[in-house]
Amino acid sequence: FPEEIGEYSLSNLFATFGHAKLLSRTQHPHLHSNGIHTHPMTLLFNALVTHKRVLFVAYHAPAKVVVDHVLAACAFVGGCGAVLRGFVASAMPYATLVNIDALSHQRGFIVGTKHPRLAELGLWDVLCHCEAQSITVSPRLSPPRPLPPFLDTRHPARPSLRHTLRSMPECMLGD
């Protein structure tokens, strides 16, 4: 698969965050899809699929821990590279203070770090603390804009596929 990535462990990701503490003051409908009963992995999936800025931190563990979690998160949300694409391009398995400028201009990312300053700067929407086994949603995260109405009465409705097929000559439909 074009976005298949190397070494990672979905088992470690689920073991770390499968029973994580959710730390957030407010509920975000695009993240907390089941309200206060949202499973931590569902919140993480929702954050990744809606291109939030997700930061994995582990201050006292080896760098491999955050790298492994970032790569596993890419595989988790993208179906191991076979279903959804584009997550590998927005991933940075290990970031340092040198990367702050690039991260501050990026709309969504999946980043890992051991440096506490990156978490303190608040460049994240969702903070996944690998050692504390907690997921924190930023209080600065704004709610999503409302979706446009399903039926727009200003424009005439387009004919359905069934109507289009019925109006086509039989020779165009084939067997």
Give the label of every model feature segment.
Residues R53, C74, R107:
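Beta-strand-rich binding-surface signature
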Residues V65-D68, A72:
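Residues within HEAT/ARM-like alpha-solenoid scaffolds
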Residues F45-A47, V67, N99-L103:
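A general structural signal for short secondary-structure junctions and capping/turn motifs
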Residues F1-A63:
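N-terminal uDENN/longin-like adaptor modules and analogous extended polar/low-complexity scaffolding regions
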